Amino acid sequence: MKGSLMRVCFYTLGCKVNLNETGALEQMFRGAGFTIVPEGEEADVFVVNSCTVTNFGDQKSRKWLRRAKRENPGAVTVLTGCYPQAFPEEAAQFMEADLVCGNGDRKAILDNVLKLLDGHERIVAVTPHQRGELFEELPVERFETHTRAFIKVEDGCNRQCAYCVIPRARGPVRSRAEDSILKELRQLAASGYREVVLSAISLPSYGLDTGTNLVELVEKCAQVEGIERIRLGSLDPDMLTPEFITRLAAVEKLCPQFHLSLQSGCTSTLRRMRRVYTAEQYAQVVDQIRAAYGERPVSFTTDCICGFPGETQADFEESCAFLKKIGFLKVHVFPYSRRSGTPAYDFPAQVHEREKQARSREMNALAEEVRREVLAAHVGTEDEVLLETPLSETLFTGYTRLYIPVVVSAPGHKSGEIVHVRLGEYDGERVRAALC
């Protein structure tokens, strides 16, 4: 059965790499004649691109597919991504999914879906990761619901953090060929994209397996005509050398917003997590970045785990104090999720779930307080905004180069354009801005 006149709905969980990979799948299905439909509409095929960082992510994937199957009993349902790759036996038992496939099997998804639409029996296809495997090329020419483009430049992680299942889900570091990245970037620029996000599982590891490095890639991306803003995904602070920082600061097109992975602001907790930096070293990297930018503004975002095994109240308070010290624009706070197959699963002194949730709520409140202080310091300053979601004919949401969320009235402009604005007050969700 061909895909002509058939509809497919995608649901994406997790990181920007998943967004990129979903974009590639959408392109694949669109090329076969399928129509992409949003959530809530009837479809012939439902695909969830899963995230398995937490147990909650697995639960959301299963819940979404159950609902899709219940509301569309004749549809084909697909479970792909990190969940089935990391836990193939568990995912295979989830019978609401007609197709279960891992991260290395995405190129076969369309063919397998067409087989299922023609009456083929249920398919489970999860290929284990292997040493020496190559980067899977999944180019994307446009994204259905985004005005910024995401380019996947690397996959895999060689680290072994005590809490993390991602190396199991993503395999070893594999870097994408530079020529392939630049070719896709030029195509995206020709399609009208002005901002690109370089996404990866371990972004600073780019080039470790190919003899190049991330900063060289950024410098070459900045030479592509039509691309006005380059944004980086998550960075590990221990991999940012002074030379690396200095060279990045010299790239004018690079958005000066750095997502530096923290996980805890307490050094003893970081050691138990098997992170390879201390809180003090993290702060030094932040200082080096600020020094490299001089009087130019720079912002920092991060992730933080609450309730890691062995975390005392004093450790938690130390982590909170560190968040205030750095002055993060945004902190993604989440309670520790106990993942089977990771060293931390068997660690002693597991923190009770109620306490993890309580600490997460407290840290979230603190992070919002710090966010308000950071945004208050930007009132009256000017920046550029990429117009994104239109709220009306003239009102848009968007983000500045610093990743400050704004709402601005921009008559005569449209989504995807970059405009110059003056920042106003924060309303609890976005900063109100005005065209300059």
Stretch-by-stretch model annotation:
Residues 52-57, 193-220, 224, 236-243, ...:
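Conserved glycine-rich "GG(E/T)P / GGGxP" loop and the immediately following alpha-helix
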Residues 160, 164-171, 203, 229-238, ...:
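Conserved strand-turn element in the central/C-terminal portion of the radical SAM core barrel
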Residues 181, 198, 232, 260, ...:
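Conserved, mostly hydrophobic/aromatic
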Residues 346-436:
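Terminal RNA-binding accessory module
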Residues 7, 72-73, 224-231:
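Short, surface-exposed connector motifs at secondary-structure boundaries
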Residues 1-206, 243, 248, 254, ...:
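Proteins enriched for Cys/Gly/acidic motifs involved in redox and nucleic-acid/cofactor modification
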Residues 210-222, 242-256, 311-328, 353-358, ...:
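Short, electropositive alpha-helical surface patch
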